[in-house]
Amino acid sequence: MPEMIRILCEGLATVLLALICTRFLCKNMKKRDFRFVPWLPYVLTGCGSAMLFLLGGLSPWTFCGIAFLFVLLYASVQDHSTHEADDILSVMMLMLAVTNISEATALSQLLGAAIVGGAQMLIALCGKKRMGIGGADIKLSTTAALLLGFYKGVIGFMLGLLIAVVAQLIITHRKKEQRTQPFALLPYLSVGFIIGYLI
């Protein structure tokens, strides 16, 4: 019984810390006039941190996942609002990836970054601008794949692209018009990468 109470207290403390950090994140996003639903970041970080704690307990993996979630959340909201993402977000993602590199995973992580980054560079160079892949998408996705490694990074990237295609088809069908403007890709890729982190 005391063990259960300890685990429950640790879980609640983890979620509470995530929600406090979310408050500061939301204040910053509001100050920069980003468009977002005010309660949604709290739901996402609260549920996300709870799920990470349930899967990993009080561990470096859990806290790395929460930091990963915060970077992706901020990048997604900024991309949705301005079609840009600050360079510092890629640097933060790179720092998370570097802290995760070990001798056993280095090759997988570098391969994941090379494949995801290379695939996006090809799409950006060969495709049309309206496909939605820009420099911020490439930098953040490449560093996310470096953090996740080959298997999880590629799966996360492919899932994110699939979600983006399906969502844009639904949006285009509902509006009954051909979409010519680029759309924010990072929110979709973020969902894929979070799923990749959890598997």
Where are these regions (language model features)?
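A membrane-topology feature that recognizes alpha-helical transmembrane segments
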Residues: 1-199
